[in-house]
Amino acid sequence: MPNGFNDWDGRSPLRTRITNSVHRGASLNDRLAEAIFRLQAQENRLAGSAARMQQHDKEMFDKCVRAQISKDNARAAMYANECAQIRKMAKVTLQCQMALEQAALRLETAREFGNIASMMAPVASVVKSVQGHITGIIPEVGYELAEIGEVLNNAVYDAGDSLGSDTGIQTSGEEAQRILTEANTLAEHRMQQHFPVLPTAPAPMAQKATEQGFQ
């Protein structure tokens, strides 16, 4: 799984380049409003995906329990393995959902109180990290986040120019990590709430599914 804050390789698609060229003429506030709207849309998509994963996990969990009751250990282990894989994807999806929720909230606060330049840089870093993590699970969300990231990066650049200074690279990195850490904590809590402990499962796989987070 890609690590956060790696450079996004690959050329921006034509639609992204055209969209960004148009957006560069829009006001900073308008671009911020669009970024918030698009982030919330992707957050909702991830919430829907997480709900479907939870439902699928419940079905596999119930089959695992029934197989264990009937002493069909091989089948119980098979269903437990399937649950472990679902939970691994579900946790990443929840982490990404929580990170986008936190990012959108930060942008809304910045828009409300005018602290736009200092907040867009860490949000852009968060979006880049989330994109790297989610692309392998839900590619269409990853592609959309790549475009949102381009919009945010251009806005960060323009905001820095308008203020005649940079946006604080060290500070923005610390704030981005804070957002991701909060997302990990929230996702862990959601996992404990909605995914019951497996009655039987290969321990290494189950443990790996619960320990992964943003790196």
Regions found by a protein language model. Give the residues of each.
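Amphipathic alpha-helical coiled-coil segments
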Residues: 86-106, 137
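Solenoid-repeat scaffolds in large eukaryotic assemblies
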Residues: 75-77
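Acidic, metal/ion-handling microdomains and their immediate structural contexts
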Residues: 48, 52, 69
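Extended, amphipathic, non-transmembrane alpha-helical segments
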Residues: 52-60
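Long C-terminal interaction segments enriched in charged/acidic composition
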Residues: 1-48, 117-215
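Residue-level recognition of alpha-helical coiled-coils
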Residues: 62, 69, 95, 102, ...
